[in-house]
Amino acid sequence: MKNILIVGLGRFGRHIAMQLNQLGHEIMAVDWKEERVDKVLPFVTNAQIGDSTNAEFLQSLGIGNYDICFVTIGGSFQNSLETTSLLKELGAQLVISRAERDVQEKFLLRNGADKVVYPEKQVAKWASIRYTDDHILDYMEVDASHAIFEVEVPEEWIGKTVGELDIRKRYNINILAVKNDGEFGIAISPDTYFEENHKLLVLGEYRALQKCFRI
């Protein structure tokens, strides 16, 4: 369980609060609008109404005590930038800030953000990959050049084993798990046998995955 601060309680911040609550974390939520704070009360441990660009207000929250500080302010990039910078100055361990454009990401990283999330860009990339190929069931970006895909087993792999196909050497990808009847099996060996109804969880570079699965 981690102690987490969320600054900015619009839709994105509210959804983060809900997910973190489901994961069992301690959450302090902050926004300058009372109605936004009221909406997250069922999902957070504590909440305060206040101006996150005010150093005294932030200091009163005990910033150094939080494992993660999320800056999810939308609508005012200036406020997001100031809040990010102040959090770092006040001893925040890890600051994760939201960007809406590429240029914002650069400024946030230069002014205290340890990491930047870009929801619109990330969702657009996910949707474009997920829904343009019928055999791609899910997708998660690992870094700029690697990803994890859930895919249907290629037709030419059916009836063969991992060892026969020599997947890692031939395609430079890793089979993380095989899904059968809704259950993922992670004990992958050279003798793992592919059947028609199998789904695969695979890790690799984008180019290798695109070539292997004809994405």
Language-model-detected regions and their locations in the chain:
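Cytosolic regulatory regions of ion transport systems
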Residues: M1-I215
